[in-house]
C-alpha cells in the first residue's frame, strides 16, 4: 500500500521542479522592485506587467496581436518545414541531386535571414508575404540539414532487409527510411520552431501594423515599459509552448523510443 504514495511523491516533485527557477526569478524581481533596487521606469515590477497584461486583454488588443503573430509564425514554419523536409529527403536519397543542390543551399544558409530583409521588402513590400517569407527562409535549413543527416544515418542493412521483403518505392520510404530519420527530423523541427519566433518578431517591427513585434515597437515609442516587458515575457512563453509542442509531436511519432532516450529533455 505504501508503494503508490512513494512513487507519486517523486512524480509530483518532478512536475514542480521546472517551475522552481522561473518562480524564484519572479519573486526576486518583485522584491528588488519594491526595495527600489530596480528603477521602475526601466524595469517594471512583475505585478505592474501583470496589470498591463490584464488591461490589454480587457481591450482585446493583446489577443489580436498574439493571434496575428502566431498565424504568421505557423504559416512560415509549415511552408519552410515542408520545403526543408522535401529537400532533405531527395538529397539524402540521391547522390547526384545532393551534388547539384547541396552546394547552393549551403551558400544560401550562410546568409543570415535578417540580412535579407531589405531585399525581401523590395521583392514583396511590407505585407504579409514578406514576413512569412523571412520565416520560411529561416526554418528551411534546420529541417533540411537534420532530414539529410537522418536519411543518411539510416542503417543500410535495414534498407536491404526491407528490399528482401519486396518493399520498394514509397512503401520503403514510409516504413523504413522516414521512421529511421524521424528522430533527427524532429530535432530540426524543434530548432526551427524556436527560430521562427525570433525572426517573426523582428520582421514585425519593420513596417507592420499588427503583431507582437509591432506592439513592442509601439510600446517603445511611447515609453510604455510595462507593455514592452510584457511582450518580451510573452515571447518567452511562446517559445516554451513551441518547444512543448515539439515534444508532444515527438512522443506521438516516436512511441517505440524509451522516454529517457528521446531527444527532448523531460
For each predicted feature, which ranges?
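Transmembrane alpha-helices
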Residues: 133, 137, 170-203, 226-229, ...
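Generic hydrophobic transmembrane alpha-helix motif, especially the helices
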Residues: 106-142, 149-150
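Periplasmic/extracellular loop-to-transmembrane helix junction in inner-membrane transport proteins
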Residues: 4-11, 34-78
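Short cytoplasmic-facing helical segments at TM-TM junctions of multi-pass membrane proteins
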Residues: 146-191, 212, 216
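N-terminal signal-anchor/first transmembrane alpha helix
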Residues: 3-33
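Glycine-rich helix-loop "coupling/hinge" segments at transmembrane-helix boundaries
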Residues: 121-122, 151, 198-235, 254-264
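Transmembrane-helix boundary motif in ABC transporter permease subunits
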Residues: 75-105
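C-terminal transmembrane helix and the adjacent membrane-cytosol boundary/short C-terminal tail
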Residues: 95, 152, 183-187, 229-266
Amino acid at each position: 500500500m505504501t508503494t503508490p504514495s512513494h512513487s507519486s511523491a517523486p512524480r509530483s516533485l518532478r512536475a514542480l521542479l521546472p517551475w522552481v527557477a522561473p518562480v524564484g526569478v519572479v519573486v526576486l524581481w518583485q522584491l528588488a522592485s519594491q526595495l527600489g533596487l530596480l528603477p521602475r521606469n526601466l524595469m517594471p515590477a512583475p505585478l505592474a506587467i501583470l496589470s498591463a497584461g490584464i488591461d490589454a486583454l480587457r481591450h482585446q488588443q493583446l489577443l489580436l496581436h498574439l493571434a496575428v503573430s502566431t498565424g504568421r509564425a505557423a504559416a512560415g514554419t509549415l511552408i519552410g518545414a515542408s520545403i526543408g523536409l522535401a529537400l532533405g529527403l531527395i538529397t539524402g536519397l540521391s547522390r547526384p541531386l545532393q551534388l547539384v543542390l547541396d552546394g547552393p543551399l549551403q551558400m544560401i544558409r550562410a546568409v543570415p535571414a535578417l540580412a535579407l530583409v531589405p531585399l525581401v521588402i523590395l521583392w514583396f513590400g511590407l505585407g504579409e508575404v514578406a514576413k512569412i517569407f523571412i520565416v520560411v527562409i529561416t526554418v528551411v535549413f534546420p529541417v533540411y540539414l537534420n532530414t539529410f543527416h537522418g536519411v543518411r544515418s539510416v542503417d543500410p542493412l535495414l534498407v536491404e532487409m526491407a528490399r528482401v521483403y519486396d518493399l520498394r518505392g514509397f512503401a520503403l520510404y514510409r516504413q523504413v527510411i522516414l521512421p529511421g530519420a524521424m528522430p533527427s527530423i524532429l530535432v530540426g523541427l524543434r530548432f526551427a520552431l524556436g527560430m521562427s519566433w525570433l525572426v517573426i518578431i523582428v520582421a514585425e517591427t519593420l513596417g507592420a501594423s499588427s503583431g507582437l513585434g509591432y506592439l513592442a515597437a509601439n510600446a517603445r515609442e511611447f515609453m510604455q515599459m510595462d507593455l514592452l516587458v510584457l511582450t518580451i515575457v510573452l515571447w518567452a512563453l511562446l517559445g516554451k509552448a513551441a518547444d512543448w509542442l515539439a515534444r508532444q509531436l515527438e512522443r506521438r511519432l516516436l512511441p517505440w523510443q524509451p522516454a529517457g532516450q528521446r531527444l527532448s529533455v523531460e
